[in-house]
Amino acid sequence: MSSVEQVRSADEATTIRMERTYAASAEEVFDAWTSPEVLRRWWFVEPSQRTAVADVDLRVGGSYRLTMEDADSGARHTVVGEYEEILRPELLVYSWRWELDKGGTGHQSRVSVRFISDGEHTTVVLTHSGLEDAASAERHSVGWSACLEHLASSAL
């Protein structure tokens, strides 16, 4: 397995792109992104967090809802969106909006996950585009890096 590689060009300050290779089939890795049971094992940033909610309606136009909860503070962070493209086990594209504490949702961005198989290994190419600004891109970069590491250590 390789470490997370991140690529960002200066003209794409609101887009992050990461790659990570896993010792698993494309089907296994794709399923880890779409199975509520498996998502609960890896979709969080900090060790003190857990995935309290993982709801998935895996169909084009279907929705998802993922909630990270901090064990110490009880703070909850929920992201919601809709699936735009599903091509198992090669591609997953979905919208991304954080729920706001005051109600409603924030800025919408887009996540594209490609699963590239070479037989025994699968490379995940994650592109998160349309983020609100460079600061948001940096925060999401930190979060996705942690999640991709947890995917390797806790789910595959």
Please report, for each region that a protein language model flagged, where it lies by residue:
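Residues at helix-coil transition
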Residues: 34-35, 44, 88, 153-156
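Hydrophobic-ligand binding "helix-grip"
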Residues: 40-41, 45-48, 54-60, 65-118, ...
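Hydrophobic ligand-binding cavity/cleft-lining segments
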Residues: 1-49
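A conserved amphipathic terminal alpha-helix motif
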Residues: 129-156
